[in-house]
């Protein structure tokens, strides 16, 4: 890439670009590790508020070490003084990519993703961080079906001064909790739970819970309307999952589940009840499900998620089918050759 260089890294292709920055793939020259690098555009690196938000994002990511959160490897300024940071490279796309490619996802996949997202949210909330922009596009996927929460660019750190002016609305409109829309200064992790409800609804049905065509219409629906139950659209949705989504989409924060860990436990209970997952360490019936990572659960939903990722990327299952067809073809050729030899004899 022409222009500023990052010492120690070989920059690769552009993964994504926005109004304030670009994300590149890169290789650590010393270790050969593939990483992603997020760098602010030169035009905004000197903007005090944008720079402060970017530095805040780095500070937050440095604190949040969790298997379901994008890993942070450090950051600083490039040779031209533009801010950047280095993070884990996740190559399976995003939940948004999956929804775009397949539409509605199987409820087993939704339960699995929900459990993993809750694990990430609980870690963030335990550290006093409210994401404020939870949406399918910020839920990244590894090739083996691990969900990674990323993009903490507008996250709120309750232990630091707020960079958002009081009464200002921040977030993505389709996933914003009522208290975000009204600019409530006392916003809590319950806002992320509302956004989680929107995400689960969309994953399960292939559509957002509210379909307003303008921002005012959308805000009005978030504040006062009730969406159709997910089970009215998604065939086979367990009633327990339906109820979890209804609870998450409650208008008042106090009417939503107590915390992300509580929702995670409900997801595990659904998985166990319908025998799609087996908890390797402790049953939800013990009441001791604290923070269950992907590696602790043998989950049909995760294997289904992995197959969806492979199908979208054109890897895995397609390759296996090709090899099976090749093996059958070779076997047929061998049989035909033997038959030909027998006929000649």
Protein language model regions, located:
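Conserved N-lobe ATP-binding subsite of Hanks-type protein kinase domains
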Residues: 22
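AlphaC helix of the eukaryotic protein kinase fold
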Residues: 41-63
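A short, aromatic-enriched beta-strand patch in the conserved N-lobe beta-sheet
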Residues: 74-76
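Conserved short submotifs of the Hanks-type protein kinase catalytic core
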Residues: 80-94, 98
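Activation segment signature within eukaryotic-like protein kinase domains
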Residues: 113-114
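Protein kinase catalytic-loop region centered on the HRD/HxD motif
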Residues: 119-129
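C-terminal lobe helix-coil module of Hanks-type protein kinase domains
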Residues: 172-278
